[in-house]
Swiss-Prot record:
Detected in blood serum (at protein level). Its main location: secreted. It comes from Zoarces americanus. SUPFAM superfamilies: AFP III-like domain. It comes from the Eukaryota. GO terms for cellular component: extracellular region. Residues 4-63 form the AFP-like domain. This is Type-3 ice-structuring protein HPLC 12. Keywords: Antifreeze protein, Secreted. The keyword Coiled coil does not apply. InterPro entries: AFP_Neu5c_C (IPR006190), AFP_Neu5c_C_sf (IPR036732), Antifreeze_III (IPR006013). Belongs to the type-III AFP family. The record marks 9, 14, 18, 44 as: Important for ice-binding.
Length: 66
C-alpha cells in the first residue's frame, strides 16, 4: 500500500507547507504520494486542512496533477 501525505496539524488556508505540518500514512482514499513531501514544502494550501486530513492534489496550489 502506498503512503499518502496527511496533515500533522491544522493547516490554515493560504499557509505555506513545511515538513513539520505533514506526515506519511497509508490511508484510503489515497492522496498525494508521500514521496512528494519534499516538493510540497513552501507550496500553499487553498483551504483549511484539519489535523489528520489526507492532502489531495486539489488542496495544494500549483501541485501538478498526477
Amino acid at each position: 500500500n502506498q503512503a499518502s501525505v496527511v496533515a500533522n496539524q491544522l493547516i490554515p488556508i493560504n499557509t505555506a507547507l513545511t515538513l513539520v505540518m505533514m506526515r506519511s500514512e497509508v490511508v484510503t482514499p489515497v492522496g498525494i504520494p508521500a514521496e512528494d513531501i519534499p516538493r510540497l514544502v513552501s507550496m500553499q494550501v487553498n483551504r483549511a486542512v484539519p489535523l489528520g486530513t489526507t492532502l489531495m492534489p486539489d488542496m495544494v496550489k500549483g501541485y501538478p496533477p498526477a
